[in-house]
Regions:
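A nucleotide-sugar donor-handling region in carbohydrate enzymes
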Residues: 124-172
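A generic structural motif
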Residues: 27-33, 89
Length: 172
């Protein structure tokens, strides 16, 4: 089996999780990696086959998404080009850790895609929600990664497809 593993490179958590998950996937399949975004401060420590700027969000001073700053620095033409040019048809499966290029390319090309991310847990109907909801953030969360099957990582396994977090060996 040939798998494309899409990793969101805009945060340290996605890369740290990939460092633990990739060796397991490599035992069972031939795995290639796409890393999109470039804000992680962690050295991946694994081979990256494809790189993309992806769709990167800028953070506000309060820790949320700075929408205007994100829009002004986005390059939708590059994003669409990357989605169209990614050779996703040569894979049997795409696994996406909230990575949009691989998941949108999989959707467009009819390749099965699974979302394995913290965001899948946060977006789950049983996930604890704040009293006031950021509608734009909720929209982005539900459309950023269009994978049909979703498995989430959260502090509590509150549903059948939600698991406790993947913790790096260095921290355990």
């Amino acid at each position: 089996m040939k798998i494309l593993y899409g990793i969101q490179g805009t945060g340290n958590g996605h890369v740290a999780r990939a460092r633990e998950i990739l060796p397991i996937l490599n035992k069972y399949a031939d795995v290639d990696v796409i890393l999109s975004g470039n804000q992680s401060q962690i050295d991946p420590g694994f081979h990256v086959n494809y790189r993309s700027e992806g769709l990167t969000f800028k953070s506000s001073k309060k820790g949320g998404i700075a929408y205007m700053k994100s829009i002004l620095t986005a390059s939708p033409i590059d994003l669409i080009r990357d989605i169209r040019q990614l050779p996703v048809k040569k894979y049997d499966l795409v696994i996406s850790d909230f990575e949009p290029v691989s998941s949108w390319s999989a959707l467009i090309n009819g390749v099965p895609c699974v979302d394995m991310s913290h965001q899948a847990a946060v977006n789950h109907e049983l996930s604890p929600k704040p009293q006031s909801i950021d509608r734009m953030g909720a929209y982005v969360l539900s459309h950023y990664n269009p994978a049909k099957k979703k498995y989430g990582f959260h502090f509590e396994a509150f549903a059948e497809n939600i698991f406790i977090p993947v913790i790096r060996k260095e921290v355990r």
